[in-house]
Amino acid sequence: MGEEGGSASHDEEERASVLLGHSPGCEMCSQEAFQAQRSQLVELLVSGSLEGFESVLDWLLSWEVLSWEDYEGFHLLGQPLSHLARRLLDTVWNKGTWACQKLIAAAQEAQADSQSPKLHGCWDPHSLHPARDLQSHRPAIVRRLHSHVENMLDLAWERGFVSQYECDEIRLPIFTPSQRARRLLDLATVKANGLAAFLLQHVQELPVPLALPLEAATCKKYMAKLRTTVSAQSRFLSTYDGAETLCLEDIYTENVLEVWADVGMAGPPQKSPATLGLEELFSTPGHLNDDADTVLVVGEAGSGKSTLLQRLHLLWAAGQDFQEFLFVFPFSCRQLQCMAKPLSVRTLLFEHCCWPDVGQEDIFQLLLDHPDRVLLTFDGFDEFKFRFTDRERHCSPTDPTSVQTLLFNLLQGNLLKNARKVVTSRPAAVSAFLRKYIRTEFNLKGFSEQGIELYLRKRHHEPGVADRLIRLLQETSALHGLCHLPVFSWMVSKCHQELLLQEGGSPKTTTDMYLLILQHFLLHATPPDSASQGLGPSLLRGRLPTLLHLGRLALWGLGMCCYVFSAQQLQAAQVSPDDISLGFLVRAKGVVPGSTAPLEFLHITFQCFFAAFYLALSADVPPALLRHLFNCGRPGNSPMARLLPTMCIQASEGKDSSVAALLQKAEPHNLQITAAFLAGLLSREHWGLLAECQTSEKALLRRQACARWCLARSLRKHFHSIPPAAPGEAKSVHAMPGFIWLIRSLYEMQEERLARKAARGLNVGHLKLTFCSVGPTECAALAFVLQHLRRPVALQLDYNSVGDIGVEQLLPCLGVCKALYLRDNNISDRGICKLIECALHCEQLQKLALFNNKLTDGCAHSMAKLLACRQNFLALRLGNNYITAAGAQVLAEGLRGNTSLQFLGFWGNRVGDEGAQALAEALGDHQSLRWLSLVGNNIGSVGAQALALMLAKNVMLEELCLEENHLQDEGVCSLAEGLKKNSSLKILKLSNNCITYLGAEALLQALERNDTILEVWLRGNTFSLEEVDKLGCRDTRLLL
């Protein structure tokens, strides 16, 4: 196979080589070894395409490992491949060791065939038992027949061996050529009319395939052209304003990419998602749907999704990574939706990506035959105006259909099944229907603190400039929080001179930042002798017509879900060449076929900003119309629609009705961004700027009053919708993402009075905001409102993107928090130390949950200080971090001086025996701790002895969790001695600790003298079934 042809991915080859044995014969594969490798075998059988699985079946059938009845059971349409693989393993295992060995051999043969097809033996074309010979030579016959099924069917039909109906069934477009060949052989097996003898003779006469068509010159030529095309499209990164062209290799900065974890799944606690490299996009375990082909990357607007895909394309085109794919086809969803004509898979790939100069039929057939070597990427699914549905099936790769039907069936796998697809989108655009067809989901969370610094250093090579910018960000937490999104880091880089020279303070809100970039563009478009030093009224007023033209175009585009504008659309919006020269409209990254030089806004957020600008200043927009903006969805479709009064969703009459219609048709996530910008523009901070541009100050006052009323009303309706608390319990509510955007809008307006009014309406004891894409900017907005609460609240922000910068933004509201939950938020020692420094003075705060972050021993001194100083502190949960014995020893010193702590969680750290000893010594006479977890901390018998001494002295501890350690019998015997003297412990968890019957016997003796303990967990230890029954009968408190 040529260089372009490549081979299976290195990971797959390595996994297969381990599973398939060290010798060709696999004679050492016993049933026990086979069963022990079951999960790996399932993964191997489903890791490729259905073609690979059916090849394994071919070999097993030819060797008579499978009977015909067995084989037919694996051809139920619609069954997931993983389900079929497990059934195959069950069937083979039940047939004994010989069958297990043959399955391993079949997998070897199928893998070898997929990489370098071998010529298999011949057969007697005049055999007296043709059906039996078709079966025994099945792999070779499928290989010989697969390119000639059409001709063979025609010939068999002419001679009366098959009916037209049977031909049509075999020719269904959902089948690959190899699958059609197999179905023809299957038909010959069950028909007794001479079809088997006919095939045996005529297949022998077919030409022998020398190699896969990947070797053909036309295929090699096309693959080379495709690589060149993709390389040209991805090698250079055009900045948002199109003013610079940078080498992607020089400027690309890794984002925080994490795999989405289903926290609802049963099983042991999961570690915090590791920050993944782009190269791990297709090799990450933990699939949502093993039978799906689509990888989803979600991220907020400006988080770097498009650049991530561009990097992927470049790595593939340069031969540096993703070489398991021979063909990569990149597409933009905002470009796809402009295609009005019906199109097929063939049209999409060839006419809208890369055209084969010769051999189109052969190349397309190659793509259909080897879909597992194909990758399609679809950028910006949130900008695709059609909502995903799986109602309309389309399975023909050659028949044309609408662009939305084509895309949706590609994502479902009805077209090009087993080809990988990567889709990027903002989270709000991903429906539950689409998630059914997602193999793996990733979160792109923007830059880390190190990423922001690295990006700025790559952008600025001038002496001292990058250092001054980084220092400015570190001193300005609000601006630093914005920069975790790459689009804001670009703005900071673009406006570095204005930021470093300004004296009025750094930007605080998103609106401030966009006005700064507006100032930058306006100043650069103004003659030097007339340019002012800032965004003054005269500068803005001078280009107001241009800004309103751009705003009208932006608003029309949002309402029509249009993000690429043709010359005719620009003309209709009165956008002139002079308006375009300002720089906010740039050439679209892809060209719509048949159009000339389409333009798009720098970024979707700029389109929302200009739409908000138009709504704030256009004389054609009556103030009352702004109420539509906060409807954020079509009536009845969105939770936001139910938050507002009916009057807010009624269309206005007359000249503003078209604007009302646009606002009602726009996508909710775009309306939310626009609403936040509008609130910022109408803030007191920017009142003077807008007043000078508005002919009627009264109209501007009415707009401002309307926005305030609408925000207050929306929040009040939201709070009133919260159901009352159960008697005796605190009111708890999980806020919806729409609530986050209302708070964001309030923060952009910077109205303390409104924030206090909103806080008065929030009468809850527990506010949950898990999985709400809360980043540093959202933290600043939450703190802006929550700091005015009259009653303490438990704030739960698990599974977000708070980070160290976000923690700093939350500090203003820490005084009203009685509990703070920050699970899975990529927080390090730096952020927690700042948090604790503030918490020392917050008497209300009694609980901290920090599991699944990046904490190390570096924060232990701060934790110890918190415990020693705050004698009303109740719970500290530090599970699944990176704390070792050194950190545990420091924390133990804080415990010695603490008299209030009731819950201490250390599971999933690395404290070991020394750490366990230090904690045990500190807790021996502790008067308040009721629950202690040291699960999964590499604790052995030495640590168990120290914990036993603690149990003998402690009179308060009620639950001790020690699962997933290495206590063994020696450690359990020590604990048993401690239990004999303990009078408070109710639950002892010892699962998965290599305990035998000897250790259990010691526990039973202790239980005879201890009436307090209610449960001892011993699951996952080394007991036989007989021992389990025996132990369970002796004491029901043993949970086995």
Curated annotation (Swiss-Prot):
| Induction statement | Up-regulated by muramyl-dipeptide and lipopolysaccharide.
**Tissue localization of expression:** Expressed in monocytes, macrophages, dendritic cells, hepatocytes, preadipocytes, epithelial cells of oral cavity, lung and intestine, with higher expression in ileal Paneth cells and in intestinal stem cells.
Q: Which organism is it from?
A: Homo sapiens (Human)
> What result follows from mutating residue 670 to A?
Increased NF-kappa-B activation in response to muramyl dipeptide stimulation
Its GO CC terms are: basolateral plasma membrane; cell surface; cytoplasm; cytoskeleton; cytosol; extrinsic component of plasma membrane; Golgi apparatus; mitochondrion
State what changing residue 626 to F does.
Abolished NF-kappa-B activation in response to muramyl dipeptide stimulation
Q: What is the effect of changing residue 905 to A?
A: Decreased response to muramyl dipeptide (MDP)
**Taking the first listed entry, what is the main subcellular location of this protein, grouped into a coarse class?**
membrane
**Where is each NACHT domain found?**
293-618
Q: What is the name of the protein in this document? A: Nucleotide-binding oligomerization domain-containing protein 2
Query: What result is annotated for mutating residue 1018 to G?
Result: Decreased ability to promote NF-kappa-B activation
Resulting phenotype, residue 714 to N: Abolished NF-kappa-B activation in response to muramyl dipeptide stimulation
Effect after changing residue 956 to T: Abolished pattern recognition receptor activity
